[in-house]
């Protein structure tokens, strides 16, 4: 089953929750990065958060190049989860704790995502572990949320280790179990490592990539 209907509904509920509770759109620190998601004026040198809303992409993003580069078919949800929208990360509450779903802010962010998916999968191969790909973070970034590439199930994964706890049999069921979390925007630190120099999606997975790329 495609995860897109569940993602569509969560995005709708997410923005409605902010409008109902705060009377405004959610806010995000773009850190100088433009995006069609931005509502209102945008100044690249501003350090203030902006209002945003998700925008469906004119051309759906694809990970076919990643599949070809690694000679590895990816579970189809990856194209739908990351390729349909431009969006800021989505905060959530759940029975497993609080966390966020990663999304793509602009085209450059998507290219960085592809590169880092390759890096993650190469690390899994180096560690002789089954392939996975990440969708978000749990418990303030201490745990990764990853997809088992063989069956599409959702798991908790500690960087450098194998998946440890299954949360859901599918990405659809996982997203359907989440509730939007209303919270003020958080300004993420820029990372010094070359693989992490993009201030969009990867500033949100600092702990993960410090662990993975620090192994060399």
Swiss-Prot record:
InterPro entries: Syd, Syd_sf. It is a peripheral membrane protein. It is found in: Cell inner membrane. CDD domains: Syd. It comes from the Bacteria. Keywords: Cell inner membrane, Cell membrane, Membrane. Its main location: membrane. One of its GO terms (cellular component) is cytoplasmic side of plasma membrane. Belongs to the Syd family. HAMAP family: Syd. NCBIfam families: PRK04968.1 (NF003439). Interacts with the SecY protein in vivo. May bind preferentially to an uncomplexed state of SecY, thus functioning either as a chelating agent for excess SecY in the cell or as a regulatory factor that negatively controls the translocase function. This is Protein Syd. It comes from Shewanella sp. (strain W3-18-1). The gene is syd.
């Amino acid at each position: 089953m495609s995860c897109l209907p569940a993602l569509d509904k969560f995005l709708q509920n997410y923005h409605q929750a902010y409008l109902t509770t705060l009377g405004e759109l959610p806010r995000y620190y773009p850190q100088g990065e433009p995006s069609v998601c931005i509502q209102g004026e945008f100044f690249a040198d501003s350090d203030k958060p902006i209002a945003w809303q998700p925008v469906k992409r004119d051309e759906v993003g694809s990970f076919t190049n990643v599949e070809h580069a690694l000679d590895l078919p990816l579970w189809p949800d990856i194209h739908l989860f990351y390729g349909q929208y431009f969006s800021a990360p989505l905060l959530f509450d759940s029975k497993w704790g609080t966390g966020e779903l990663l999304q793509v802010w602009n085209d450059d962010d998507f290219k960085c995502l592809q590169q880092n998916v390759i890096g993650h999968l190469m690390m899994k191969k180096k560690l002789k572990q089954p392939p996975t790909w990440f969708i978000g973070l749990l418990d303030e970034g201490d745990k990764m949320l990853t997809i088992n590439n063989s069956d599409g199930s959702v798991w908790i994964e500690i960087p450098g280790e194998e998946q440890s706890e299954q949360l859901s049999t599918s990405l659809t069921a996982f997203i359907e179990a989440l509730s939007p979390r209303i919270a003020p925007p958080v300004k993420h630190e820029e990372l010094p490592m070359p693989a992490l120099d993009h201030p969009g999606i990867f500033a949100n997975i600092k702990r993960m990539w410090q662990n993975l790329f620090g192994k060399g």
